[in-house]
Structure formats: C-alpha cells, structure tokens
C-alpha cells in the first residue's frame, strides 16, 4: 500500500540531490508527485496486463529515464527546467543510474562500490543503493528472512534535508521489516 508514496519520496530525494535542495519548491515537489504517480500507474497497468495475458515476463520497473521522459512531456515551465537539470543524469556523462541495474541482486552478499564515482554522484548513488537495498529487505521479509545492512559513508546522507529524511525513514522501515542496519 505504501509502494507508490515510497517511490515518489525516493524520486523527490533523488531529484533534490540532482537539482539542489533550494530549488525544491512546492511546485517542483508537486510536479515530481504527479509524474511519479503517472509513471507508477503505467507500471501497475503493465503488471496487470502481464497477469491477464498469463505472461511469464514481469514488466521491468520504471527507470529514471522513464521519469525524465514524462517530466519533459509536462507543460509547466518548471517541469521543463527540471528536465534540463536531469538531462546529464539521463543522457549525459552522469547517466550511471538511468537504466536497469546490472547488479546481480540474487547473491546473498552484495557490495556496492562507489569509490570510482565522481564526487558529484556520491550522494545520489547512496540514495539509489538504499532504494535497491530496500527492495531486497521487502523480498527477504516476505520469505521470513532478516536482512543485515552495513552503511559506510553515512555522513553523506546528512548533507541535505531530503537525504536526512530519506535515511531516517529507510532505517525506520527496515526495522519494521526485519532489517538490521549498522552505521
């Protein structure tokens, strides 16, 4: 039931890291909410269609590229400005997280190495990694398993309001779903 609100909160946090926290006006936050709801509604429609068609293929989760395309299609000037700011992270040199992940999430022990990422990508990468980790926590919870999470470089989340809120909620959610977080 919290799937879409949690995903939209992640999009807000990720976009704040990209465009700057001071740019996150109520209009920007509302646009992110609208586009996020639209994007995940389309995803849920694809899921339902896959069930009806008896398809064994699950639709892929939306990517930041999908979010960017929908944002760019909005009529408001603020949406156009946000899309321009996001462009480097979708089509440009910082497009590390714009596509489906190449990390094998079926391993029991997963390490995300961020050492070689540009400094401008560190905060954003930590948020993307936590979102991926959260999906694993949910999967393990459904199987009755605990998930142990070690977060190095925790201080990176403390540099912005959205980062602080995201990590706080992440830790609280993990505890409710048998996640054990060590900082």
Tell where the protein language model's regions lie, with residue ranges.
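P-loop NTPase motor domains
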Residues: 1-179
